[in-house]
Curated annotation (Swiss-Prot):
GO terms for molecular function: ATP binding; ATP hydrolysis activity; ATP-dependent protein folding chaperone; unfolded protein binding. The lineage of its organism: Eukaryota, Metazoa, Ecdysozoa, Arthropoda, Hexapoda. One of its GO terms (cellular component) is chaperonin-containing T-complex. Transmembrane segments: none annotated. This is T-complex protein 1 subunit gamma.
Length: 544
């Protein structure tokens, strides 16, 4: 009866649907392709990638997240791989390259099982179990406690992070900057620890000079000049007032019409405006400040009154800069000048000065007594160098912050991966569980590859070291990223924060699980151009 009927089309005709094993294997290929792009960026001998954006700008970096941000990919699985690098960067600030390499290897480890027609949920169950065991081992057996007061140990950990970057040549300077900045912005109150480096540790880049001139200012630096040329540009122990309102005549919120009949009406209007500005300036002068910062404008008349009172004014600050100055000098940001009181005035700053660096004027509020905000001043030969230095420094700042918030360490140089791999292997569970153990070895293997060592020999020797370890302590044998030799990380002093490693493993395994769960891709609801690949397999080739 229904034999001659047309098949029912549910999907649009220009929509392509792929499902089953083919999709899972394509997802794995896409993940591996992204991991291969990033692999050479791991370790102290990492190569740089030069990327050109659509606007013609050039980015040179070995930061996993920065590279993937610039690459344009089409395959949906590749896009989710890029997303995990961003998550890693936001959460812990370091380990972006490791997480991509590890996620790619976790996917590759699942490929043979899929080809043997093992169901993805079986693989996923084994991966989950392996992840739980890894996290348990890391927290109990493979990590050591760090004393935050031990500055030398803290410096070693940050140095290990910085050593793999472009800034590694100036590692001592970078470590000092990172630790100083984090120590400055650390706020401990009511048993709560807060380290907000994003808001209160601002990085200011000024082209010119040498990288060695970079430093941490115990205060705030902003790219502004005084509003009037005759105002003071150097004040010691200034009294600072911070405003969130304009020092100009305030116009009404709604539209108003004024009818002027005679000349005296016009004169009266001007007089009212003048009196208003005079009143707000009188409110400010009453608390005897030396310095006024406002986020809005300052009229010429207000400048005149403030100059007569010997007060320096700086206008149009960013909200974030105003908050930093408030934290640094102890002032309170005031919204209405009538409400200004003595306790709103900041007296914590030791020096205010305006300096000319290059062609621009910069305002410095420094030598603060108890600054809970700071500015990192970076100098360098070119914009590209400054941008890469800033990216590297952000990683160092995040590592220092992680140590303050969670002071536990694991051995670097692939030692912790090999130790975790051995612990999983000893459990003697067949199948995908063991595949996770082998996948972890990609980190020491890549470190050996990137410095030109004999990978097979190095890995076999490292495996033997870990297999023969029977003591209670952490087995800290790993690959020296500089030479490719096997060294004890206790001696070499290469440690990494536990928080970074935990996040790396969780993200990598969860991503592999997510991509293995996909068995259907419906793509292409809009018409494509003739030169674009239409199937996801072809898309995966487009990212390199």
């Amino acid at each position: 009866m229904f034999g001659g009927q047309q098949p029912i089309l549910v999907l649009s005709q220009n929509t392509k649907r792929e499902s089953g094993r083919k999709v899972q294997l394509e997802n794995i290929q896409a993940g591996k392709a992204i991991a291969d792009v990033i692999r050479t960026c791991l370790g102290p001998q990492a190569m740089l990638k030069m990327l050109m954006d659509p606007m013609g700008g050039i980015v040179m970096t070995n930061d996993g997240n920065a590279i993937l941000r610039e690459i344009t990919v089409q395959h949906p699985a590749a896009k989710s791989m890029i997303e995990i690098a961003r998550t890693q960067d936001e959460e812990v600030g370091d380990g972006t390259t490791s997480v991509i390499v590890l996620a790619g290897e976790m996917l590759a480890a699942a490929e043979p099982f899929l080809q043997q027609q093992i169901h993805p949920t079986v693989i996923i169950r084994a991966y989950r179990e392996a992840l739980e065991d890894i996290v348990g081992h890391l927290q109990s057996q493979l990590s050591i406690q760090l004393d935050v007061k031990d500055k030398a140990k803290m410096a070693d950990v940050v140095k290990a992070c910085v050593g793999t970057k472009f800034i590694g040549k100036w590692s001592d300077l970078a470590v000092k900057i990172a630790l100083d900045a984090v120590e400055t912005v650390t706020l401990s109150e009511n048993g709560r620890l807060e380290v907000d480096i994003k808001r209160y540790a601002k990085v200011e880049k000024i082209p010119g000079g040498a990288i060695e001139e970079s430093c941490v200012l115990k205060g705030v630096m902003i790219n502004k000049d005084v509003t009037h040329p005759k105002m003071r540009r150097l004040i010691e122990n200034p009294r600072i007032v911070l405003l969130d309102c304009s020092l100009e005549y305030k116009k009404g919120e709604s539209q108003t019409n004024v009818e002027i009949i005679g000349e005296q009406d016009f004169t009266r209007m001007l007089q009212i405006e003048e009196e208003f500005v005079q009143r707000i300036c009188a409110d400010i002068i009453a608390v005897k400040p030396d310095l006024v910062f406002t986020e809005k404008g300052v009229s010429d008349l207000a400048q005149h009154y403030l100059l007569k009172a010997g007060i320096t004014a700086i206008r149009r600050l960013r909200k974030t800069d105003n908050l930093r100055i408030a934290r640094a000098c102890g002032a309170t940001i005031v919204n209405r000048t009538e409400e200004l009181t003595e306790k709103d005035v900041g007296t914590g700053a030791g020096l205010f000065e305006v300096k000319k660096i290059g062609d621009e004027y910069f305002t410095f509020v420094t030598e603060c007594k108890e600054p809970k905000a700071c500015t990192i001043l970076l100098r360098g030969a070119s914009k590209d160098i400054l941008n890469e230095t800033e990216r590297n420094l952000q990683d160092a700042l995040h590592v220092a912050r992680n140590l303050v918030l969670e002071p536990r360490l694991v051995a670097g140089g692939g030692a912790v991966e090999m130790a975790a791999s051995q612990l999983l292997t000893r459990k003697q569970v067949k199948g995908p569980y063991t595949a996770v153990a082998h996948a972890l070895e990609i980190i020491p293997r890549t470190l050996a590859q990137n410095c030109g060592a004999n990978t097979i020999r190095a890995l076999t020797a490292l495996r033997a070291k870990h297999a023969s370890h029977t003591g209670d302590g952490v087995c800290a044998w790993g690959i020296d990223g500089e030479s490719g030799e096997i060294v004890d990380m206790n001696v070499k002093n290469i440690w990494e924060p536990l928080a970074v490693k935990l996040q790396t493993y969780k993200t990598a395994v969860e991503t592999a699980i997510l991509l293995l769960r996909i068995d259907d891709i419906v793509s292409g609801s809009k018409k494509r151009g003739g030169n674009e690949p239409t199937n996801p397999a072809a898309m995966a080739q487009g990212q390199e």
